[in-house]
Amino acid sequence: MKTENIPYKIYLSESEMPQNWYNVRADMKNKPAPLVNPGTGKPMGFDDLRPVFCDELIEQELDNDTPYIPIPQEIRDFYKMYRPSPLVRAYCLEEKLGTPAKIYYKFEGNNTSGSHKLNSSIAQAYYAKKQGLKGVTTETGAGQWGTALSMACAYLGLDLKVFMVKCSYEQKPFRREVMRTYGASVTPSPSNTTNVGRAILAKDPDTTGSLGCAISEAVEVATTTPGYRYVLGSVLNQVLLHQSVIGLETKIALDKYGITPDIIIGCAGGGSNLGGLIAPFMGEKLRGEKDYRFIAVEPASCPSFTRGVFAYDFCDTGMVCPLAKMYTLGSGFIPSANHAGGLRYHGMSPILSRLYHDGLMEARSVEQTSVFEAAEYFARTEGILPAPESSHAIRAAIDEALKCKETGEEKTIVFGLTGTGHFDLVAYQKFNDHEMTDIIPTDEQLAASIAKLPKVAE
């Protein structure tokens, strides 16, 4: 192992933890487009969103101008249970690759949820409790978000109803049991318990489900059950705001040792982890203070950035949610049942979509067999079993490090290791038994889905 002045793990003290979330929209010249009411075609304001979301979260969702928003003390106290999270220098990986590149990863898996999702779940549950609500509803893909929200709701005494994407519900039964242990009810989606679920099943009884389906069901229950609101784990502005703690901690840790990254990499499904990781660095780029390369990595089976279009679309399959302007494959697109359940979303964060459209970041798609090759390589060198979602970022980080090996450049690479893969062993089994396949949508399939996008006057 190499020995340098930089420790293997950089830990911040509790006093160095961020006291404010950073709102990257404040520094964006071109703001994300507003959410639009599908019935009227007009931008949605506070009153329009109240039946679905908690009041203070709506304020955060609509705030494009305040750069720093204070983190309530109660949330900061909860963060101390598992934060600050370590920034790790991947010395072992560097040595194994034989690269001159310096590789760092921000590890968000040191909590029971196994991922970064707890950063936003406690914030959203806090505001729901503060509003006097009885409970909340949500969707979950691989189960990390549902687990994180079940932990937050148990801590604050809120009821929770989770709709879990059917293929993940079946692939990850133990993740389901963790949620139930924390008091949540968990229903496979699509289900026969909602109108939208029944409609989807009537059209395709064998569907594996999608995050878009699960969102539709969760929103339906929230809006028809008194004392409930819907909360979500990704995509919208409020979630990326809460996740900015990842990037803020990362920047503080790097600055302590005088490290400036050249490349920052994150996996991209709905955008919560990537948006949180890059936030303060993107702010510097937007203000003209520094320049970085940002790389979003998505599954080839659900390539919203790389093969989607930048347009208004429904956030959910059942078309009950507001319209968001984002990179999308069409709300009716159901990706193949790949093992990165947290990345199986048809769209992308409006914030990240705007930044990508403006040329401020890059995107690439990778096949899941290649992703698991990288995951296994990383596990054998760094000792952490990574989540399939996180492994998309690992794949790109390794590829960039190997490019440095060819050129001799000593670039500094930072990537987000969003969580662990302890509940993803069915996926690892498929890979180890050589039963994993890559199913990539055809141009015709994507064109058919995109052709059904709603028409919105801009």
Segment roles from a protein language model:
Residues 107-118, 136-145, 239, 265-270, ...:
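Active-site nucleophile and cofactor-binding loops and adjacent substrate-binding regions
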Residues 86, 105, 117, 124, ...:
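Buried hydrophobic positions in well-ordered alpha/beta secondary-structure cores of metabolic enzymes
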Residues 268-276, 368-433:
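Claisen-condensing/thiolase-fold acyl-transfer catalytic domains that form or cleave C-C bonds
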Residues 120, 128-167, 260-274, 294, ...:
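A short, small-residue-rich loop immediately preceding and capping a beta-strand
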Residues 137, 145-208, 304-316, 424-433:
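Active-site-proximal loop->helix
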Residues 68-70, 200-238, 246, 258, ...:
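Active-site/ligand-binding loops adjacent to catalytic centers
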Residues 3-133:
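Positively charged, low-complexity intrinsically disordered leader regions
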Residues 123-133, 147-159, 180-181, 278-288, ...:
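Alpha-helix C-terminal capping segments
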